[in-house]
Amino acid sequence: MARYLGPKAKLARREGTDLFLKSARRAIGDKSKFETKPGQHGRTSGSRTSDFGLQLREKQKVKRMYGVLERQFRRYFAEAERRKGNTGANLLLLLESRLDNVVYRMGFGSTRAEARQLVSHKGITVNGEVVNIASYLVKTGDVVAVREKAKKQLRVTESLKLAESMGLPAWVQVDATKLEGVFKKSPDRDEFGSDINESLIVELYSR
């Protein structure tokens, strides 16, 4: 399955929530009408969505939010099952540990897609080494930095300013002068993704 390249607002409306696919500088506002499904006037249905439908919808929402394809997502779920603790929480923590997501959380990209592009174009280092794999899992204590060639990009500095004004997550520490940050710890489940119901995804893969 290829990555979706169409209108981001359409995806948000399909899932009924903001997927944070667009920069806060161009945030999806009221016009997106998340509660209205794609189509000129939205699709209507007199039938209640099945449990399977709800589970599938939640999985699709999380995949699109983090920009992960089905095969990758299944691998993350398998790893989450192998780890101790709650499988659903483990799954989300794995997704949060992806390098592209950490770059986004640190404010070096205004969206996960922009952060992913920065990584793939070799604009990011981890502990001083260039890493261009978006799915690379960042560990506690790792230092993630913007390379010199990428520091000149106005979008990087603008994104960081915006992120700082909105408040950076507690699990990262960012030096705005050096354009680098430390992944202080894995976030607690209650620190992010309050609109995600990971138990539905666990139920889906347990069928």
Swiss-Prot record:
One of its GO terms (cellular component) is small ribosomal subunit. The keyword Magnesium does not apply. Residues 97-158 form the S4 RNA-binding domain. Keywords: Ribonucleoprotein, Ribosomal protein, RNA-binding, rRNA-binding. This is Small ribosomal subunit protein uS4. Residues 42-52 have a biased composition (Polar residues). SUPFAM superfamilies: Alpha-L RNA-binding motif. Part of the 30S ribosomal subunit. Contacts protein S5. The interaction surface between S4 and S5 is involved in control of translational fidelity. GO terms for molecular function: rRNA binding; structural constituent of ribosome. Pfam families: Ribosomal_S4 (PF00163), S4 (PF01479). Gene3D superfamilies: Ribosomal Protein S4 Delta 41, Chain A, domain 1, RNA-binding S4 domain. Belongs to the universal ribosomal protein uS4 family. One of its GO terms (biological process) is translation.
